[in-house]
């Protein structure tokens, strides 16, 4: 879950393949439509008795449509550039009239807003996270389901279905396989239930990142320094400290037990404020913004 959450937060999906040359399993990571495997086309033929003419086919096709958000707005605060405008707004559909509403997300933890007009915004910028979120919403706009007898079907493939009026345009133009369930037994033929989304040039598959761990309350720690018995506070230019979490049993180089951690202060501004430096050994309580373990601060 930890790996899939981190990858899902930045829109990366993966699949397992086999290297026939080295006879090993391989994990492939992708973040765009370039990772799709294309070229699989199957006919729409419902099963009839025990005779399939030795041809793999697709049947039981369904499409479900939902109204999703028209655009995504994000905002964050970067104390390093406190006056910078961190608002971004992205519409990945390029004007789809069937979408509606604005999804607003606060504190995706980015440092720069990025360009909302760039289809490939700077990684981990506000526009980047807004586009990832909107593409994830668009993944739920059209959901495709079906059953096939093809044993080589795998997630990440683009399946096209040929046939008559029973084949919806979504299947005729191509469906990206996002999930599948394979089953077979003695009294029933081999079959694969699959889920998918339309193969679109406007957006790609974006996995759900899953729930993030929540750090409730505070944790005890002590301020550290690279100098033993330091008489001054060991801080950086932004007034941040390094701390030693008291629950941590690993051994670290003195003064490098953590990344720089910001201290919350009762009075602070652009060019004014009050900061009483903490000396090495001072006990502090570590809190977490919105319970996010990636955003600790000295309470």
What are these regions (language model features)?
Residues 1-299:
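Amphipathic alpha-helical and helix-coil boundary elements used as assembly
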């Amino acid at each position: 879950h930890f790996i899939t959450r981190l990858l899902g937060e930045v829109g990366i999906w993966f699949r397992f393949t086999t290297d026939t040359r080295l006879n090993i399993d391989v994990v492939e990571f992708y973040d765009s439509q370039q990772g799709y495997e294309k070229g699989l086309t199957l006919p729409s033929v419902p099963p009839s008795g025990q005779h399939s003419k030795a041809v793999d086919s697709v049947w039981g096709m369904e499409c479900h449509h939902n109204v999703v958000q028209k655009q995504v707005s994000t905002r964050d605060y970067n104390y390093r550039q406190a006056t910078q405008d961190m608002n971004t707004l992205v519409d990945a559909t390029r004007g789809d009239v069937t979408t509606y509403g604005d999804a607003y997300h606060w504190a995706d933890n980015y440092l720069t807003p990025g360009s909302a007009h760039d289809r490939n915004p700077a990684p981990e910028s506000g526009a980047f996270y807004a586009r990832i979120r909107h593409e994830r919403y668009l993944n739920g706009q059209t959901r495709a389901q079906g059953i096939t007898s093809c044993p080589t079907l795998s997630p990440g493939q683009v399946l096209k279905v040929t046939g008559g009026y029973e084949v919806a345009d979504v299947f005729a133009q191509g469906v990206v396989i996002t999930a599948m369930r394979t089953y077979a037994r003695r009294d029933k033929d081999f079959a694969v239930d699959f889920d998918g989304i339309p193969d679109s040039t406007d957006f790609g598959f974006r996995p759900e990142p899953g729930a993030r761990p929540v750090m409730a309350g505070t944790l005890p720690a002590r301020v550290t320094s690279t100098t033993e018995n330091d008489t001054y506070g060991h801080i950086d230019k932004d007034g941040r400290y390094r701390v030693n979490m008291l629950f941590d049993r690993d051994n670290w180089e003195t003064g490098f037990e953590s990344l720089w951690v910001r201290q919350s202060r009762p009075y602070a501004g652009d060019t004014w404020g009050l900061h009483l430096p903490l000396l090495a050994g001072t006990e502090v309580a570590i809190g977490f913004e919105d319970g996010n373990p990636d955003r600790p601060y000295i309470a």
